[in-house]
Curated annotation (Swiss-Prot):
InterPro entries: Fmt, Formyl_trans_C, Formyl_trans_C_sf, Formyl_transf_N, Formyl_transf_N_sf, Formyl_transferase-like_C_sf, GART_AS, Met-tRNA-FMT_C. It comes from Actinobacillus pleuropneumoniae serotype 5b (strain L20). It is an enzyme of class 2 (transferase). HAMAP family: Formyl_trans. CDD domains: FMT_core_Met-tRNA-FMT_N (cd08646), Met_tRNA_FMT_C (cd08704). This is Methionyl-tRNA formyltransferase.
Length: 316
């Protein structure tokens, strides 16, 4: 195995963990591409991405083009003369000129077992859909959306209480060693490229705040999965009327109970064991929630000052 000169492209913390693995390896990271700094926090100060922060700690040149479609940006990247470009949650579309610039092209770490869950939110959608397992795929990028040839897959089960946050953490542990295996075998072509079967593909649509609103006409099982899939963002919520004012309450944890005899959206019970709400099928038992302006709390703490919010028989 010879040392590879690598361009790394990524933006969030998930990507930074892969960059760290490359920095700890025998390979040479010659440049980092990441999204432009964005306003964050109350002061709306410009904040560097986790990938940029890590790169600067290691004195690696950082490039932050708004787009890679322009010829000057493409020429700048090509001039780096990299062996390979590694792309992890970068957030920009790579034109064909960029994909073909490095000697071995561009490799992508994708958070699903392709061709299942192509697109922006594979980790969240695997929980949302009730998948039993997921994993990461290292693929050779092409001009399609997550359609490139697959080089390596690593699988992991999805636990019954898995949230997107916990699954992100799990995949962030699994993926970097898998990436290094592929990089170490690039020269010898140790990993044979496997075409994706488009007939088995589906699309992992971005999450939206609107989708996070709990719809009592869904089943309790689906709502419970939504609560886990939408944690840490955008967090599921319900709305209810209190003294003529609509209140929004975020929901962090719930479980499913089988019995039900009332119309969907009816409060069946509210005590220290949970707030039970009838759904289209089954009962959603909410155990951790967050009123506006407060921290997440147990159902008992919530009901201590707000018992009337979820009166038995109330229709949400």
């Amino acid at each position: 195995m010879s040392k590879l000169n690598i361009i790394f492209a990524g933006t969030p913390d998930f990507a930074a963990q892969h960059l760290q693995a490359l920095l700890d390896s025998e390979h040479n990271v010659i440049a980092v591409y990441t999204q432009p700094d964005k306003p964050a926090g109350r002061g709306k100060k410009l904040q560097a991405s986790p990938v940029k922060q890590l790169a600067e700690q290691h004195n690696i040149p950082v490039y932050q083009p708004k787009s890679l479609r322009k010829e000057d940006a493409q020429a700048e990247l090509k001039a780096l003369n990299a062996d390979v470009m590694v792309v992890v949650a970068y957030g920009l579309i790579l034109p064909e000129a960029v994909l073909n610039a490095p000697k071995y092209g561009c490799l992508n770490v994708h958070g699903s077992l392709l061709p299942r869950w192509r697109g922006a939110a594979p980790i969240q959608r695997s929980i949302w859909a009730g998948d039993q397992e997921t994993g990461v795929t290292i693929m050779q990028m092409d001009i399609g959306l997550d359609t490139g040839d697959m080089l390596h897959k690593v699988t992991t089960p999805i636990a019954a209480d898995e949230t997107s946050a916990s699954l992100y953490a799990k995949l962030a542990e699994l993926a970097p060693p898998a990436l290094l295996e592929v990089l170490n075998g690039l020269e010898s072509q140790a990993f044979k490229a496997e075409k994706q079967d488009d007939a088995l593909s589906n699309y992992a649509e971005k999450l939206s705040k609107e989708e996070a609103k709990l719809d009592w006409n869904l089943t309790a099982c689906q709502l419970e999965r939504n609560i886990r899939a939408f944690n840490p963002w955008p967090i599921s919520f319900l709305t209810l009327e209190v003294d003529g004012v609509e209140q929004s309450v975020k929901v962090y944890q719930a479980n499913v109970l089988p019995h039900q005899a009332k119309a969907a959206g009816t409060v069946l019970q509210a005590d220290k064991n949970g707030i039970q709400i009838a759904t289209q099928e089954g009962v959603l038992n909410i155990t951790q929630l967050q009123p506006s302006g407060k921290k997440p709390m147990s159902v008992q703490d919530f009901l201590n000052g707000r018992a009337d919010w979820f009166a038995v028989g109330k229709q949400l």
